[in-house]
Amino acid sequence: VEDDPYGDLYFDQAPPASLLSLSASVPGSRDWLAHCGSLSKVLCPGLRIGWLIANPELLARATMCKQFSDAHTSTYAQATAAQYLRSGVMPQTLARVRAVYAKRAQAMCDALRSELGDAVEFVQPQGGLFLWVRLTGATGQERDANALAKRAIEQGVAFVPGAPFFSQNPDPSTLRLSFATADEERIREGIARLKKAFKA
């Protein structure tokens, strides 16, 4: 299963080839691949349009599950998405969106470095909407993301503790920060509030 809602949200260099594109050169591999994508992350959060590329048997079963779940995706939303995609402006939209998210990601990384220093570790994101952070516990700082989350809320900022994202052996020192909706100034303010939560 290749779940790829953020694949088009790269900042500088395009990501490595998807399994879907690689499957074209490996005979029979498409029969074993299920590729999922979405417009809600790259175009409009309220436009709940996604797709599944898979073998016919899996598609038939997925269609049945979808129909039992909610009958079908809004016809209006589908028509709106189709018209937009036919218009040919998606490449320009993606370029603008990538530039916005790249600036937000940079602002978050810069703020984390200046405000929290060695209390956190992270890899600068090359795309997407999130930053994965590990609390180091340096100089006696917090290492428990759940405990920090409670204090962060008291400071007026929130994040998602990382443990639920693990399929096994969750790491309680991890957290996921989002730069999707806040502008650069609000991101800096949020990280400053997170610093206060460390000291609370």
Language-model-derived ranges and their functions:
Residues 1-200:
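PLP-dependent class I/II
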